[in-house]
A protein has these predicted regions:
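Conserved SAM-binding loop of SAM-dependent methyltransferases across substrates and taxa
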Residues: 234-247
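Non-catalytic accessory regions of SAM-dependent methyltransferases
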Residues: 1-122
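Mobile active-site "lid"/loop adjacent to the S-adenosyl-L-methionine
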Residues: 294-324
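Non-catalytic substrate-recognition/targeting regions of SAM-dependent transferases
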Residues: 106-119, 135-208, 216
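Conserved class I S-adenosyl-L-methionine
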Residues: 224-233
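S-adenosyl-L-methionine
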Residues: 257-298
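Conserved SAM-binding motif I beta-strand of class I
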Residues: 248-253
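C-terminal catalytic and target-recognition region of SAM-dependent MTase-like enzymes
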Residues: 334-396
Length: 396
């Protein structure tokens, strides 16, 4: 198949030769033809060498490469890439695990499918496009996914409201590409715990599957502790803390809907358990009035920075938030603190936490350095795929 052609400026092919999948608009010399946004294009070096095939998009990232050779983007291509991603999850023991039916099946560049995310919740796949090209390909991808998983897959929900470029002229509606809404509550299981998943109206695909291993680690620290879970959203950390034997768990979120989700998930797993309380309140306001009763605190805020132009303000926010936690946590307490901002580097985040600790004059030791789980694999050629970073700290 013949695709529109994009030619790069001289010496702008180096990153592609190192297998980085992004081509920035400043590297483009000319475009032969008039490809529509989201179209498949071929990319060439200035000397005419074919560099790869990818999705064209208007914006800072002009092309997201799907392959670094000459290929046809057809059903066989989508099926091959999805099978590769699925095989990895099988190797990790995530598919049809007896006490776990919740995992990420496709993680963008890490699975050589830039701009695509697919999360599995039992027999439902929730698909999210982060590029116009993946949006246009959504039905082809759904067809390949159904062929791969067969009857194990009963529904595919496409949810890309908020993840597609707002300037793109797209006729977009979140919808079921397979199956339909069956009514009632959607439930999924993570390590033997049940969670209500709202992929229709919830954040992301309905649940933060990237914190699975970190929630499991927190469970090991929770025994006989008084736990504060800030930015609780669906209450994942709270539920794990309760199973870990926490003396009391307080969940805080500025969203009353998030608080309701947390209370529902606690009730699903620990009905009539009076150890849990939830508060709909601003995080800083709550920490300001809180006593010094907590000996395990979780800080898992939403992304403070999605663009580099607000990085400085984001780092100040992390410093302020962690300082407030350091001031409140009891001696010998444990702090789980996270950043999910891709533009905040691991070193930047650690420096912000260090500054907060120094400001409060607490003695702090690093026990664990955390990241995203293996079903969010990072291509060694695309370090930008590592976005989640966390620290587990012992505070004297």
């Amino acid at each position: 198949m013949t695709y529109p052609k994009i030619y790069l400026k001289p010496k702008k092919e180096e990153s592609v030769l190192r297998l980085h999948p992004w081509i920035f608009s400043g590297a483009v010399a000319r475009i032969d033809g008039q490809p529509e946004e989201g179209a498949v294009v071929e990319v060439f070096a200035a000397d005419g060498r074919l560099l790869g095939v990818g999705h064209y998009q208007i914006g800072s990232i002009a092309v997201r490469l799907l392959a670094f050779d000459e290929v046809t983007i057809d059903h066989a291509f989508w099926l091959d890439r999805l099978r590769s991603a699925y095989n990895l999850r099988q190797m990790l023991g995530l598919d049809h695990a007896p006490e776990n039916d919740t995992y990420r099946l496709v993680y963008g560049e890490g699975d050589r499918l830039p701009g695509l995310v697919i999360d599995m919740y039992a027999d439902t796949a929730v698909m999210q496009a982060h590029s116009v090209g993946m949006h246009h390909a959504r039905r082809d991808i759904a067809t390949a996914l159904r062929e791969l998983l067969g009857d194990r897959l009963q529904a595919i929900y496409y949810k890309s409201d908020g993840t597609l470029p707002f300037k793109a002229a797209l006729d977009h509606t979140d919808e079921y590409l397979l199956g339909r809404y069956s009514g009632g509550e959607h439930l999924a299981t993570e390590r033997g715990l049940r969670f209500g998943i709202d992929w229709l109206k919830g954040q992301k695909t309905g649940f933060f599957v990237d914190q699975r291993e970190n929630r499991r680690l927190l469970e090991q620290y929770a025994s006989d502790r008084t736990v504060l879970n800030m930015f609780c959203y669906t209450g994942g950390f709270s539920v794990y803390a309760m199973r870990g034997g926490a003396r009391a768990v307080h969940s805080v979120d500025s969203s009353s809907k998030a608080v309701s989700l947390t209370e529902r998930n606690v009730a699903l797993n620990f009905p009539d358990d009076d150890r849990h309380r939830a508060f709909a309140e601003d995080a800083f306001d709550y920490l300001r009035r809180a006593g010094n009763d907590y000996d395990l605190i979780i800080l898992d805020p939403p992304a403070f920075a999605k663009h580099r132009d607000v990085l400085r303000n984001a780092l100040q926010g992390y410093r302020k938030l962690n300082a407030a936690a350091f001031e409140k946590i009891r001696p010998g307490g444990i702090l789980f603190t996270f950043s999910c901002s891709q533009v905040v580097s691991r070193n930047d985040f650690r420096l912000a936490v260090f500054t907060a600790a120094a400001q409060t004059r607490r003695h702090v030791r690093i026990l664990h350095q955390l990241t995203q789980p293996a079903d969010h694999p990072v291509s060694i050629y695309h370090p930008e795929g590592e976005y989640l970073k966390g620290l587990v700290l012992e505070v004297e």
